[in-house]
Regions:
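ALDH superfamily catalytic-core signature
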Residues: 25-178
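A structured beta-alpha segment of the ubiquitous adenosine-cofactor-binding alpha/beta core
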Residues: 1-21, 25
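Short, basic, helix/turn surface patches
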Residues: 1, 178-180
Length: 180
């Protein structure tokens, strides 16, 4: 338990570790690789972070279970609570289906109910830590600075029940590939 940097360094430099696998940010991967070389620990790194979901026109050939699963996949994978490091953080959508596809996605996102995860009426809980909440808040600010158009959400969620909780509104921004 603790900060990823401290724990990661300890694990990657420990003599009992026989293999390192990491998925995440490039600069962190470079650091892990440097540490792993100290004991010549085999390493597998998947770096980059901004892996997209790609949606082509064919997903809308029928308004069926497959189409619903495509929407659900985008919505649910994009709205974890900080526990999934392989989470796709953007979607590339074929232009001809963009409007009707996003209309359905936004409807689904608006149906997400934030709150205590022990309450079965809620569908999304808080972020897993204060640091994760702050990291996401920083990205929300960057998106605005980079000129992204907020389609839904885009802010810290304040609840009267838990005003200091680590909740973030489910958010979708529209932008371009050069955005951070």
């Amino acid at each position: 338990n603790g900060a990823g940097g401290k724990i990661g360094k300890h694990l990657v430099t420990h003599r009992d570790v026989k293999k390192v696998a990491f998925t995440g940010e490039t600069s962190t991967g470079q650091e892990i690789m440097r540490y792993a070389t100290e004991n010549i620990i085999p390493s597998t790194l998947e770096l980059g972070g901004k892996s997209p979901n790609v949606f082509f026109k064919s997903i809308m050939d029928a308004d069926d279970e497959f189409f619903d699963k495509a929407i659900e996949g985008l919505v649910l994978f994009a709205f974890n609570s900080g526990e999934v490091c392989t989470c796709p953080s953007r979607a590339l959508i074929e232009e001809s289906i963009y409007e009707p596809f996003m209309k359905r996605v936004i409807e689904r996102v608006k149906a997400i109910k934030l709150g205590n995860p022990l309450d079965t009426e809620n569908t999304m809980g808080a972020q897993n830590s204060f640091n994760q909440k702050e990291k996401i808040a920083k990205y929300l600010k960057i998106a605005k600075e980079d000129g992204a158009e907020c389609l839904v959400g885009g802010d810290i969620y304040h609840s009267s029940i838990n005003p200091d909780g680590f909740y973030i509104e489910p958010t979708i921004y529209k932008g371009h590939n050069k955005m951070r």
